[in-house]
Amino acid sequence: MAENPVCTAQVNIGSGSQSNSCISILGSNSINSNSVPVLFCFSVFARPSSVPHGSGYELLIQKFLSLYGDQIDMHRKFVVQLFAEEWGQYIDLPKGFIISERCKIRLVPLQIQLTTLGNLTPASTVFFCCDMQERFRPAIKYFGDIISVGQRLLQGARILGIPVIATEQYPKGLGSTVQELDLTGVKLVLPKTKFSMVLPEVEAALAETPGVRSVVLFGVETHVCIQQTALDLIGRGVEVHIVADATSSRSMMDRMFALERLARNGIIITTSEAILLQLVADKDHPKFKEIQNLIKASAPESGLLSKV
């Protein structure tokens, strides 16, 4: 959750009188008869304002947005809490609560759930292929191997009907996606300058793809574009699976520490074969034979996995 707001005001939400500190912070001269003074708290900030008598949850959210709109990521989930004088702490806003007297409330981002089962289904999954470009070939460790595994993943996506989104980092200077990767039928191929793949076009594509809850992510570089993409996605409530045998960096140290950090943040570090077999789940799956043929040739033993 966000840090507890630093507020000096103490308020009484019962029928008694308000404390002097709250009155001095909120002021009383500018409040008309139909307005109720409220101290709105978000993160470490507290801002006094007023709302119409009888305001409920939706109006409170709108007020939070008007006060802190540039700081609130509305892709996150939030809970509105009310300071309860009786308990001396914040409590979740009771169902049906309306503003009837001076009070103090806060907006709290919910913590990302760090424990996830990591189940995958073709209908709820999208593959992200990140910046597998020609100019990176000489610099990225085991680049030829991650291309080979990346192609296996793209073939698997086509077999299972899974959408693929690919990006190219500044293609004018860094070239196009390598020829070994067949991008036939991918949903999007987008140029970018931002390190994260979570561009407006990508967000729109995810929004128009019903039921998506998981992204399988691979490409380069692990500690830059892969890491920033993964963090942006989990911040939006999307489960992320990073394919360890299909992602690399120029430095193995950068790669190792990025994967460790991402795993601590609830991102699943996995392999290409595990992904593909999880997606079919059963030998009686109509596409199992095609996936089996795809994985019969083992993924390259490049040394990447010993560095996870």
From Swiss-Prot:
InterPro entries: Isochorismatase-like_dom, Isochorismatase-like_sf, Isochorismatase_domain
CDD domains: YcaC_related
Pfam families according to UniProt: Isochorismatase (PF00857)
Family: Belongs to the isochorismatase family.
PANTHER family: HYDROLASE, ISOCHORISMATASE DOMAIN-CONTAINING PROTEIN 1
Name of the molecule in the record: Isochorismatase domain-containing protein 1
Source organism per UniProt: Xenopus tropicalis (Western clawed frog)
Lineage: Eukaryota, Metazoa, Chordata, Craniata, Vertebrata
Gene giving rise to this polypeptide: isoc1
